[in-house]
Amino acid sequence: MSIRDQILAVQDIPTQLVEVPEWGVKIEVRGMTGAERTRIMDKATADAGEMNLQMIYPEIVIATSFDPLTGEQVFVPEDRDILLSKSATALDRVAMVGMRLSGFTKESADELGKDSSETASEDLSLN
């Protein structure tokens, strides 16, 4: 089997069962695919290139929350505004796990605020 075939065959999306006491449930939080993460980053980045947390937290909760019994997604995009009315602690609990499982780091959030040419020149200076 080629390396390509091995990579494409592996299940590489991490999961974690998260207890959300504010909601009285456990949610399976899954990491996002590359496409999902890119979509959310594009959607949550304001015109100035800064992360809009009011936008990104519910988007991450929607994208990463699954029913541990059925495997179905818990929320749909139309739930975004109603999620913003829920406990900030609960949203933070789920979103932070979703971000960690999806490779969001402080460094990746900081990169969103940089001009792409600035980032490219920094990357070149690492060589």
Whereabouts are the PLM-identified features?
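Extended acidic low-complexity intrinsically disordered regions
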Residues: M1-P14, L126
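Short, surface-exposed, charged amphipathic helix/loop patches that serve as local interaction elements
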Residues: P14, E22-N127
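Catalytic micro-motifs at enzyme active sites that drive phosphoryl/nucleotidyl and oxygen chemistry
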Residues: L17
